[in-house]
Amino acid sequence: MNSLLMITACLVVIGTVWAKEGYLVDVKGCKKNCWKLGDNDYCNRECKWKHIGGSYGYCYGFGCYCEGLPDSTQTWPLPNKTCGKK
């Protein structure tokens, strides 16, 4: 029983360590902007939305940075997107 608990705990830790992270993007392929660096309610809320699926978000380099994202979530920079430029 203890072995099963230990294996389960290890899998949870590995999943957390290997989770994707990065800057959120808008429809133009740009980083979602933020102005209050560090802990930021807006970024945390955006990262945790159901369609995003992140575990935590904060403002870093004036962009919303998310941790614990699923692989399906797009992060900045996007290939073939120039952030609204032609």
From Swiss-Prot:
Coiled coil regions in record: none
Secreted in keyword set: yes
PROSITE patterns: LCN_CSAB
Domain LCN-type CS-alpha/beta: 20-84
Disulphide bonds in the chain: 30-83, 34-59, 43-64, 47-66
Keyword list, A-Z: Amidation, Disulfide bond, Ion channel impairing toxin, Neurotoxin, Secreted, Signal, Toxin, Voltage-gated sodium channel impairing toxin
Signal peptide: 1-19
Cysteine amide modifications at: 83
Pfam families cross-referenced by the UniProt entry: Toxin_3
Similarity field: Belongs to the long (4 C-C) scorpion toxin superfamily. Sodium channel inhibitor family. Beta subfamily.
Protein name (database record): Neurotoxin E1x
Organism lineage: Eukaryota, Metazoa, Ecdysozoa, Arthropoda, Chelicerata
